[in-house]
């Protein structure tokens, strides 16, 4: 993870990334107090603020609960997955981008691309999510579901050029 973060922030980040079994962004709340019962509410709150400062989580402060509501970001998987799964989501996203450049029709359905990659959903989703910002918004299939970051893409030439640049910049 990031060495400049406190030891508690690193443990919290790893815990949350491990808890996201399907590789999708997760939601956490006061259960973190139970999961880290040896820590104070203040120390956990400070560690969460560190994670938020690095863009690894977003925090929503609400009345009542002891801790803010926590939502992990894709950057958390990028930071933690090499240690958790042994796979780097950035390197994996380059593999997926190359598959999409070679066969753009694979982008239509995330499930089809996942099958061709041959990866577990836990490995696939963070890598796939890293490609979403490089596809024009109107060509991204976004129905509400809990399987993938998006259901797929309808790739146009501009998107393929963006993916080629992504591969160039991340290889």
What label would you give each PLM region?
Residues 1-16, 73:
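Winged-helix-like regulatory helical subdomains adjacent to P-loop NTPase cores
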Residues 11-19, 95-103, 127, 134:
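Short amphipathic alpha-helical elements of helix-turn-helix/winged-helix folds
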Residues 22-36, 105-116:
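Short acidic, hydrophobic short linear motifs in intrinsically disordered regions
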Residues 38-54, 118-133:
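Short amphipathic alpha-helical interaction segments
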Residues 52-63, 132-147:
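A short, conserved structural fragment
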Residues 64-72, 143-155:
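Minor-groove-contacting beta-hairpin "wing" of winged helix-turn-helix DNA-binding domains
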Residues 74-99, 153-171:
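Short, amphipathic alpha-helical interaction segments positioned at domain boundaries
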Residues 89-117:
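Leucine-rich, amphipathic alpha-helical/linker segments
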């Amino acid at each position: 993870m990031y060495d400049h973060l406190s030891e508690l922030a690193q443990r919290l980040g790893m815990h949350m990334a491990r808890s996201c079994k399907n590789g999708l962004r997760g939601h956490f709340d006061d259960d973190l107090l139970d999961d880290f019962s040896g820590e104070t509410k203040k120390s956990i709150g400070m560690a969460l603020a560190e994670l938020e400062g690095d863009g690894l989580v977003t925090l929503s402060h609400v009345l009542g609960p002891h801790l803010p509501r926590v939502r992990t970001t894709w950057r958390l998987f990028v930071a933690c997955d090499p240690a958790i799964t042994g796979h780097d989501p950035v390197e994996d996203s380059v593999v997926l981008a190359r598959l999409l450049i070679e066969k753009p029709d694979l982008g239509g359905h995330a499930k089809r691309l996942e099958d061709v990659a041959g990866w577990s959903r836990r490995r696939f989703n963070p890598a796939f999510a890293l490609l979403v910002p490089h596809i024009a918004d109107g060509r991204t299939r976004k129905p509400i579901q809990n399987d993938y970051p998006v259901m797929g893409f309808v790739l146009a030439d501009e998107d393929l050029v963006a993916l080629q640049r992504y591969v160039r910049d991340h290889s």
